[in-house]
Amino acid sequence: MRRLFLSHVLGAWLLLSQLPRELSGQKPDDVIKACGRELARLRIEICGSLSWKKTVLRLEEPGLEAGQPVEIVSSSISKDAEALNTKLGLNSNLPKEQKATLSERQPSWRELLQQPALKDSNLNLEEFEETILKTQSEVEDDSLSELKNLGLDKHSRKKRMIQLSHKCCYWGCTRKELARQC
C-alpha cells in the first residue's frame, strides 16, 4: 500500500515538473531595475525561455489566433502592385527584359514637362531642376534627422542596447522591452 502511494506521488511530481515554469511571478509590464550582471542574467532568463517568447507574442498580437492567415503586405502596396501589373499587362507584346526596365524606370524631366500640369507653367529647365533638388535634399535631411532622433543612424543595434541598458539601470525597463531585443 505504501509503495503504491509513493509511486502515485512520484508520478504526480514528475507530471507537474514537466509543466512550464512560472517566470518569477512577474507580469511583462512590471518595471524592473537591473544593472550589470543582474541585467545580463535577466536577459539570458528572458531570451532563453521559450514559454516567455510565446507569452510575449501572444500579448503583442491578441487578435490573432493560431491558424488564422496574416496579411503581411499592406493594402496600399498591393493596390499599387496590381495597378503596375495591369499596366504591364497592357504592354504584353514587350519582351520580359523591357517590362522589367519599364517598371523600374523613373520618368525623365522631359516626360514630366509633357504632363498637362507642367506644360502650362512657366518653369524653365534650371528652375525645374532646382525645385527637384531642393525637394530631394529636404526629404533626405528630414529622414536623416528622424533616424538620428531614433538612434538608428549608425551601429543601431549597439546604440539601442546601450540605451536600453542605461534605461534599465537608472529608470527601469519592462520584461517586454528586454524580450524585443532577443
Curated annotation (Swiss-Prot):
One cellular-component annotation, GO: extracellular region
Q: Which Pfam families match?
A: Insulin (PF00049)
Looking up InterPro entries in the UniProt record yields: Insulin-like, Insulin-like_sf, Insulin_CS, Relaxin, Repro_Hormone_Insulin-like
UniProt entry tagged with the keyword DNA-binding: no
Under the heading SUPFAM superfamilies, the entry gives: Insulin-like
Cystines in this chain: C35-C169, C47-C182, C168-C173
Function (record text): Relaxin is an ovarian hormone that acts with estrogen to produce dilatation of the birth canal in many mammals.
Family statement: Belongs to the insulin family.
Protein name (Swiss-Prot/TrEMBL)? Prorelaxin
